[in-house]
Amino acid sequence: MPWRKDRFCWDALLLAGGRSLRMGTDKASLVVEGVPLLQLQVRRLREAGASTVWISHASGPAPSPSRHEDIRWIADGAPGLGPWPGMRQALQASDADALLVLAVDLPAMTPCFLRRVANPASHGVGRIPETPHGLEPLCALYPLPAAAVASEAIAMDGEPSPRRIAIRGIREGWMQVMAVDEADAPALVNWNRPGDWSPVAPGTGA
């Protein structure tokens, strides 16, 4: 959706096309709180205020978390290259003011945390969380068109990635670092191995 004087509009890109080799199964299909993790994350993004949710998935027929969800699918036609191919397509296709990129395997993510990420200081500025472990480019808001232009420039002289785009944005002033305190840091912990999985989202109790 286009920029309006009284409203900042952002789309979301949910990254669900990874091969999940260490997990041994598709992370997006893990059942959490009674629904597939993919559907849970779509719900959280909607509650946070996303205008459109794009989903980057592995090549092949697009599954659907719910026939009622207003979502758009992006086929990852370059497996093994990480999140970049899906992010590039979404940056080019979205007509929102910004794109919030989210990895599907962050089970403790909350709509409240996502709203903080999607609340930049001003129009044209994105936000990227930073914990003591570093920047979190797979849960960050990238402003358009600056991020799209930067991604193409990076692709011309090296291997592009969300991290490189974010670092360039910080350097050029169109990405803002959002410090994350210890209480909120669990929202950014991902699941990588079978032992990490739980049918209850971390932090919600039994």
Where in the sequence are the language-model features?
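Nucleotide and nucleotide-moiety/phosphate-recognizing core
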Residues: 2-160, 167-187, 195, 201
